[in-house]
Amino acid sequence: MCIRDRYMPYTVELGRSFVSLDYQNVRKNSKSIFALDNLWDGLGALTVINPDVRYFFGKMTMYPSYIRIGRDMILYFLKKHFDDKDHLIVPIHPLSYEHPEEQLAKIFTGADFREDYRILNREIRHLGFNIPPLVNAYMNLSPTMKLFGTAINDGFGEVEETGILIAVDEILDEKRVRHIDSFVKEHPEALHITSGANKLIYKDRA
């Protein structure tokens, strides 16, 4: 079955997310530490209100100003652990590493995701950087995330965007409890899609 039949009817495309300036600085606003949580809460609610949603399709963005060896390490790590073996989607002009793949392979010698993740986090910090927040969040959301490669977005500041697909029912339990189950507990009426969801979304029509 092709991606058009198996995935597209049950997939929500994730648009570009942006954290408001008021929430980007922890020192100025303590609520900023919850900005990403709010994003996941919204996606969790979406899966409850729209139970036919099985997949999230979107992209992770990195900027050309990010240190090159760090970018290559992140992309190599993602490919090693999340590469789409089925080639469901491929970039027309895929982005290549700027450092030899053999050099990157020698860095990630862990036996599993957790060991390699610790290596990645350590090496990126040694460079004086952090793993980009959204990239870090996505790679820790589901062990079966599919990675579709990376390409340059010429129409959006030459950013480097990596395509991903996440199966909703394979989101890690801790994330599910935090962002999906919590919504159901607070809004049980959302489970009754035809009778309750609209009242939840459009309170003035309740």
Model-derived features: where do they sit?
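Phosphate/diphosphate ligand-binding glycine-rich loop within oxidoreductases
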Residues: 1
